Amino acid sequence: MNKLIRRAVTIFAVTSVASLFASGVLETSMAEFISTNVISLADTKAKDNTSHKSKKARKNHSKETPVNRKKVAPVHESKATGPKQDSCFGRMYTVKVNDDRNVEITQAVPKYATVGSPYPVEITATGKRDCVDVIITQQLPCEAEFVRSDPATTPTADGKLVWKIDRLGQGEKSKITVWVKPLKEGCCFTAATVCACPEIRSVTKCGQPAICVKQEGPENACLRCPVVYKINVVNQGTATARNVVVENPVPDSYAHSSGQRVLTFTLGDMQPGEHRTITVEFCPLKRGRATNIAMVSYCGGHKNTASVTTVINEPCVQVSIAGADWSYVCKPVEYVISVSNPGDLVLRDVVVKDTLSPGVTVLEAAGAQISCNKVVWTVKELNPGESLQYKVLVRAQTPGQFTNNVVVKSCSDCGTCTSCAEATTYWKGVAATHMCVVDTCDPVCVGENTVYRICVTNRGSAEDTNVSLMLKFSKELQPVSFSGPTKGTITGNTVVFDSLPRLGSKETVEFSVTLKAVSAGDARGEAILSSDTLTVPVSDTENTHIY
């Protein structure tokens, strides 16, 4: 029991001396003296054994000396620093402080060294977590001289070496090597401390939304045919785009089924890489160029636009026909038909069809197919701006108003295209009024009667109007009575009939005058005929022999 108590007292004494030395209270010589006496009192063995006990006490002292008030880990041997043949110190061993919170620090020193020869002290700091402002302090042994350090530093007035590490990451190591030269025999106690501020990092992911808009639409479209555009919106950024809105003003030359002039589409939030497609349909109102503009906006971002220009084409064919407003029956009349393409597209399979009224005969139509009163021309293509001209020669057999109808039909990329025109000609007939005068009894005795018959015939193709007849007789004949389609008057030897308002084509009327022979001789009877057609009156004379 006494032996156990003596051993415990010895360990306690050596540990106390080591603590006082590490804190700088005892000098090296004093610590060595106390340690030696304690060991001698504890064990009365031979001097050699005493020396062995003293060395063992130092080793125990090193194991149990607290560093920064942390548990000292078991010693680990390491190889000596520097070339083996030049070393004046023993194998390195390591003292480790377990600290799972901030920084783990280890210190490696040789087991023994030679007075006057430098030996290394290796300090290794390992980050247990991310730390900043890491300060490592080493207390130099009292009976030793500072030689150098790596990284380099300068001892303070109280014999301390200080290194500052701005940042030591988790798992990262920082090594410091200090060379000191012992000046006296004894134990060289070296203490190192570390102070660090744990670094807490917070990560906020920052991104930038990038809304892009593209638009697809036709380069060409047809008038009055639907035009469809596709608006593609995509978030090519790295953050969510909030409150994405697409606005599409309706172009002036377009109309939308909703009647609105600005179309608005609310897309809401769009994640990175998200894609949306909007389809809009318009109806073109007029030909020409139309530009559709789509604008996209989102919260905190600038507006982007995309536009597509479409040429609105109108397939158009025009036809006109020109001819005489009036003409005489049986006189040829020429009609000129003009066909043109004022549109934007090529017209194919163009058919020009001219239909004449019954009673009109086609005399000539170059390059056409004639069938009764129909004339047809065909053309494979009619380019924009191109025009064609056709002529047709006709003649009417009867008077009247006749219309010439022309229809043009064609095909294009926008469908069929049709146009029509007409021309009306008034065909006039020509009145041809003739008169024939004959006496029924010739010769005639004085005192007897004879009858003059006057036949008026319109041999023409048109009626005659205001047909008037007047008869004059010589003194040998005395008018007694008359008859006809109109009334008449007898004045002396003259008979005048009222005008006949109308004498139709191929119509014949007859006038008669009864005459009494009053004296012998060669009598004469003259009939004078006038009408609207006869600008100069026509006369006819008949003679009668009276005996």
Swiss-Prot record:
The entry's keywords: Cell shape, Disulfide bond, Periplasm, Signal
Gene Ontology cellular component terms for the protein in this record: periplasmic space
One of the protein's GO biological processes: regulation of cell shape
UniProt subcellular location: Periplasm
InterPro entries according to UniProt: Chlam_OMP6, Chlamydia_OmcB, Ig-like_fold, OmcB-like_DUF11
Start and end residues of each stretch annotated as Disordered: 45-84
Protein function: In elementary bodies (EBs, the infectious stage, which is able to survive outside the host cell) provides the structural integrity of the outer envelope through disulfide cross-links with the small cysteine-rich protein and the major outer membrane protein. It has been described in publications as the Sarkosyl-insoluble COMC (Chlamydia outer membrane complex), and serves as the functional equivalent of peptidoglycan.
Official protein name in the record: Large cysteine-rich periplasmic protein OmcB
Organism of this sequence: Chlamydia trachomatis serovar L2 (strain ATCC VR-902B / DSM 19102 / 434/Bu)
Encoding gene, per UniProt annotation: omcB
